[in-house]
A protein has these predicted regions:
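Beta/alpha (TIM)-barrel catalytic core signal, keyed to glycine-rich beta->alpha loops juxtaposed to Asp/Glu
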Residues: 1-127
Length: 127
């Protein structure tokens, strides 16, 4: 509640217009909304979570919550840390890329990735 009170003070002073969350779950978001409503504080209007063809966690429960609570998605990593750009096709790792620093790109690379990724890249190339 203290965080929401501080955010409300920032809103009332004109320093921010709205508030949102990042990397939050549906349960966590619903708790923020309940606290805001209970104490007449500003409600979250956006959620910034990862979302791409390879990361669809938002679709499991956040999409429903976002729809019913009018919370917009500000997706990040829409190209899945560069995987969907094709620069890592066939397992290559160009010098100076994220993958040259973090080999599995934060857990995105696993044995199931390459068949799906190659399928997406094939479709993209044909269209």
């Amino acid at each position: 509640m203290e965080t929401l009170q501080h955010l409300d003070n920032l809103r009332l002073s004109g320093k921010i217009r709205h508030i949102g969350l990042s990397n939050e779950t549906a349960w966590g978001t619903s708790r923020w909304l309940t606290t805001a409503r209970t104490h007449n504080l500003p409600q979250m209007v956006s959620i910034q979570n990862e979302y791409s063809l390879l990361c669809r966690l938002f679709d499991l429960d956040m999409a429903e919550l976002s729809h019913h609570e009018n919370i917009g998605l500000l997706s990040y990593s829409p190209l899945a840390a560069g995987l969907l750009s094709g620069k890592y096709a066939d397992g290559t790792t160009p010098t100076g890329t994220r993958r040259s620093i973090n080999a599995d790109l934060g857990g995105r690379i696993n044995e199931h990735l390459w068949p799906a990724l190659n399928g997406y890249l094939d479709i993209a190339e044909r269209h």
